[in-house]
Each structure stands twice: as C-alpha cells, then as structure tokens.
Amino acid sequence: MKRKSVYTCLVMLLMSLALQAKDKDVAVAEALLKRLLPSYIESFQFQKLKGEKDCFTIESVKDKIVIGGNNANSMAMGLNHYLKYYCLTTVSWYADIAVEIPEELPMVGEKVVSEARVDTRFFLNYCTYGYTMPWWQWKEWER
C-alpha cells in the first residue's frame, strides 16, 4: 500500500512538471528576443497557438506585449511585425547593429491577427547564397 502511494505521488509530480514545461517554440522565440532586445525580455510574452496554418497574433495585456503563434517562426514574424509597425524600426542583417526601439514600448490598440495566405513560402533570393551568405558566421545566421 505504501509503495502504491509513493508511485501515485511520483506520477502526480511528473505530470505537474510536464504541464509546467515551457513549449519549445516559445523557448525559441524568447531566445530570439533575448538576442535582439535583452533589456526588454520582461516586456514581452510569447504564447503557443493551436492550428496547422501559420499565423500570429499581437496584443497588449496589462503592461506586456503578448505575441502568439502556432510555431517559433510565426512568433518571430509577430515580433518583427510589432517592431516594424509599432516601434517603427527594422532588424538589420548585420548582427553588430543594435535594434533601436522606444524606451517605452508602444501598446497595441486592437488585437492584430495575421494568417499565412499560402502553404509554402520561400526565404531570400537564391543569388544571395553566392554574394554574402558564404561568409556569414553563426551569429548572422542566428539573427
């Protein structure tokens, strides 16, 4: 009987830890934010959205910018959208150039919802592989 209660407690502990475990996509988005805007990490929150189609949402909840996405790439798109249209800034390809944003982050009025229009998309022009990318280091790729 005692052994059964120990096993029950162990299973309950493991289940509660599993529920508290951070989603991998959320962790990846947070790592991106930490690289780009380390002093603003507490001002943002990322949430995993359900669904297969790529999408992101952006909203202000209390004093935080909440970005949702169905995967890490969608969350990164949401962060880029917020930086571009609310902070009026861009993220340079050059890893040594800091992202400049207002000291006080602009709040999002109405919730932003964006969904991919097509299933398959591509990134970059194939010619760029011969112009700059062969000389990139990991910090450029990671950015």
Regions found by a protein language model. Give the residues of each.
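Hydrophobic h-region of N-terminal signal peptides that target proteins for export
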Residues: 11-20
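Bacterial N-terminal signal peptides that target proteins for export
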Residues: 1-8
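Long, folded non-catalytic interaction modules
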Residues: 43-49, 55-58, 68-69
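Cleaved targeting-peptide boundary
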Residues: 22-27
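Low-complexity, Ser/Thr/Pro/Gly-enriched N-terminal "stalk/linker" regions
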Residues: 32, 36-37, 43-45
